[in-house]
From Swiss-Prot:
Family: Belongs to the short-chain dehydrogenases/reductases (SDR) family.
InterPro entries, per the entry: NAD(P)-bd_dom_sf (IPR036291), SDR_fam (IPR002347), SDR_superfamily_enzyme (IPR051122)
GO BP terms, alphabetized: paraherquonin biosynthetic process
EC number(s) from the headed UniProt entry: 1.1.1.-
Major enzyme class: oxidoreductase
Oxidoreductase as UniProt keyword: yes
Reaction catalysed by this enzyme: protoaustinoid A + A = protoaustinoid B + AH2
Protein's UniProt name: Short chain dehydrogenase prhI
Family annotation (CDD domains): SDR_c (cd05233)
Function field: Short chain dehydrogenase; part of the gene cluster that mediates the biosynthesis of paraherquonin, a meroterpenoid with a unique, highly congested hexacyclic molecular architecture. The first step of the pathway is the synthesis of 3,5-dimethylorsellinic acid (DMOA) by the polyketide synthase prhL.
Major site of localization recorded for this protein: membrane
Protein location: Membrane
Length: 257
């Protein structure tokens, strides 16, 4: 399906939502997938001999280093692709209400962990003279009107990190892009979020933006994790050769407002 036969691909957030859909599609395309998640290994892919699972809390400082060491132990000193999908939401907390814990967790998982994983895989990709990294952003990567300050800052930061990596390693065969989904059903990103704790005033301010996109689902036009998986695999593969440093909305035109 995609030209990634026998490629070693690391996928974070692999146990649910977009991460699981991407893992399933990558395996179907012949890749060897190293899945990372804080949740249990997904039963739908665990039995596949080309799937290796590593349990990790990406907010821990050493998790990226340990994960890549485990990947090398499983598949050797080869990493062709990295999909940084794992992420956490905030509670729409504003600059005047955000807690230290919420800020620290969003930055740690949504920004610091992807950067640390890139730091670990890029030297391996440089040795091979080739590699592809796809980070997953959000509508909040390009707007200040859809989420809280912690999530928004983390996703804006990931855009900057993506562009920096793309330019720095453009002559070494390493590409880096960021796909920004919006309005995807059942992503798992809200798991563990207590909806009763949302900043109601901030949520009300942003409701007009949310409602504009919610109409897609009512009309049967909402995106599913599998839709995002195809976009991610396209940009991971050589089908998108020459595309690097790009910020790609996959949100059925939500990014136009």
């Amino acid at each position: 399906m995609y030209n990634i036969q026998d490629h070693v691909v690391i996928i974070t957030g692999s146990s649910s939502g977009i991460g699981l859909a991407a893992s399933t599609l990558a395996l179907a395309s012949g890749a060897k997938v190293f899945g990372i998640d804080i949740s249990n290994s997904p039963t739908s892919v665990t039995a596949n001999p080309n799937y290796t699972f590593f349990a990790a809390d990406l907010s821990h400082p050493e998790s990226a280093k340990k994960a890549i060491a485990a990947c090398i132990a499983a598949y050797g000193n080869r990493i062709d692709g990295l999909l940084n999908i794992a992420g956490v939401m905030d509670l729409n907390q504003s600059a005047d209400t955000v807690t230290d814990d919420m800020w620290d967790r969003c930055i740690a998982i949504n920004l610091t962990a992807p950067v640390k994983l890139m730091r670990e895989v890029i030297p391996i990709m440089r040795l091979r003279g080739k590699g592809s990294i796809v980070n997953v952003g959000s509508k909040a990567s390009m707007s200040g009107a859809v989420s809280g300050i912690a999530y928004t800052a983390s996703k804006h930061g990931l855009v900057g990190a993506t562009k920096n990596v793309a330019w720095r390693f453009k002559h070494e065969g390493i590409r880096c892009n960021i796909v920004c989904p919006g309005g995807v059903a059942a992503t798992g990103i809200r798991d563990g979020v207590d909806s009763t704790q949302f900043d109601s005033e901030a949520l009300e301010m942003m409701s007009v933006i949310h409602q504009a996109h919610a109409s897609d689902h009512a009309k049967g036009l909402g995106l599913q994790p599998e839709d995002l998986a195809h976009s991610l695999l396209y940009f991971l593969s050589d089908l998108s050769k020459g595309i690097s440093g790009a910020v790609i909305p996959v949100d059925n035109a939500w990014s136009t407002i």
